[in-house]
Amino acid sequence: MCRKFLGIFCSVAVLFCFSPSTSLAELVIVSTDQGWEFSTDGMVNLFAVTSSGDERPDNVNNGITLGDGNDSFRLRSGFLPGVLAFNVKAPTTNGLDMGARIGFYPNPQNANTKNSFSAQIDLREIYFTVDGTFGQFLLGKTLSLFQGQNTLTGMTLMGTGVSAISGGGTTLGNIGYGYIYPQFNAQIRYTTPTRYGCKLAVGIYDPSVIASTGIEAGVTKAPRFESEASYTGDFNGLSVKTWISGLYQTAEFEESGDEVEANGVAGGLALG
């Protein structure tokens, strides 16, 4: 548990702050008369972080945050790594808009070792979309629905949040302090059109083993299911966003064949 975490450089050095996922402008490199578009977006960030930690409470398994007496200074990425992404949009055909995105997410630091080659480059996004009056179908890898909005609306998204001493990856933000990490996973997702500020998204996902300390149900015979219902509106200049998401999956123990299930429900409210 971190007692304090301070980003000395609280500003983010942005080379390209053009992300379609945040409805900002893109840098369009190629646009043809036939309607094809190629664009790129990205971001670079680096924080100076000094941290100290308190003693971990009892019964904490696999704790990776700072412990008692752990003081640290790092030059590192924050909760978000860097971003370099490429987008392709096809011309509208029979009312359908099709596109694809591939996103690389590198971190600037090594794992607290000068001559290490451990800086991570995450291939977090690679997906294809089809949009129409029916809504959107997405196939590929991107952020999961369950607790995804909890991550995207977190106050540490563009900052640092909870960190550990070493490591070549990002900080934890607020992960473990009210929500778990949704992760970027392979999926087939359908999202309805927005009606009166409301929309629903449902998806089938590449399943995961269901495990705890010393035990694992590793036989996955069915996909994982995730969903999210959300509402966005404006009341006298006050923007309101609320959501609820869910997850369900089963797995079996290899030797006994016994089945276990994992399920969860999460929600949130954001005012701006």
Which functions belong to the PLM regions below?
Residues M1-F9:
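Bacterial N-terminal signal peptides that target proteins for export
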Residues F9-F18:
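Bacterial N-terminal signal peptides
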Residues S19-A25:
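Sec/Tat signal peptide C-region and signal peptidase I cleavage site
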Residues L27-T50, S72-V209, K221-P223, S230-G233:
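Outer membrane beta-barrel
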Residues S52-T65, N110-L123, L152-M155, P207-A222, ...:
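Outer-membrane beta-barrel translocator domains and adjoining extracellular loop/strand segments
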Residues I64-D71, G169-N174, A251-E254:
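Extracytoplasmic loops and strand-loop junctions of Gram-negative outer membrane beta-barrel proteins
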Residues N70-F73, I215-E216:
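Second-shell loop/turn segments in exported
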Residues A222, S227-G272:
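Detector for outer-membrane/organellar transmembrane beta-barrel domains
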